[in-house]
């Protein structure tokens, strides 16, 4: 199974790139973590945010390979603790589909992305900066994998 993070935004700060790479490189070959960056729409004083979200959503959904499970990150989504995420990872593996996790930009996800989702996951009730979410996602997914593989990374 491949896990794909589809995230709005390019040109992230160096610490974001390094943090993401640190965890993504640890994934086993049979479960690679791939990042697909979607160019963010231009935001300014008179920007049409609805139109920007629509365009970003179209680009995100176009990046999802046919047949992939779509999981959106959204505050009202289901909350999983680490063990529940590990269980979810196992369920995804049994489903025999690759997984695309959609991470929105500053205003969140387009309605079309939410409508296309097979699942919606709330990473936190807090509003997190979208660059930070990439690092948190990579670490959380790696930790969940480590539990399923009985790897010593996760300690209770």
Curated annotation (Swiss-Prot):
GO molecular function, one term: rRNA (pseudouridine-N3-)-methyltransferase activity
InterPro entries: Alpha/beta_knot_MTases (IPR029028), RlmH-like (IPR003742), tRNA_m1G_MTases_N (IPR029026)
Keywords: Cytoplasm, Methyltransferase, rRNA processing, S-adenosyl-L-methionine, Transferase
Gene3D superfamilies membership: 3.40.1280.10
One term under GO cellular component: cytoplasm
Subcellular localization: Cytoplasm
Spans traversing the lipid bilayer: none
UniProt-annotated binding residues for S-adenosyl-L-methionine: 73, 104, 123-128
UniProt key word S-adenosyl-L-methionine: yes
Enzyme Commission number(s): 2.1.1.177
Reaction(s) this enzyme catalyzes, per UniProt: pseudouridine(1915) in 23S rRNA + S-adenosyl-L-methionine = N(3)-methylpseudouridine(1915) in 23S rRNA + S-adenosyl-L-homocysteine + H(+)
Pfam families: SPOUT_MTase
Disulphide linkage map: none
HAMAP family, per the entry: 23SrRNA_methyltr_H
PANTHER family from the UniProt entry: METHYLTRANSFERASE (PTHR33603), RIBOSOMAL RNA LARGE SUBUNIT METHYLTRANSFERASE H (PTHR33603:SF1)
Record-stated family: Belongs to the RNA methyltransferase RlmH family.
Subunit structure: Homodimer.
Function: Specifically methylates the pseudouridine at position 1915 (m3Psi1915) in 23S rRNA.
Protein name: Ribosomal RNA large subunit methyltransferase H
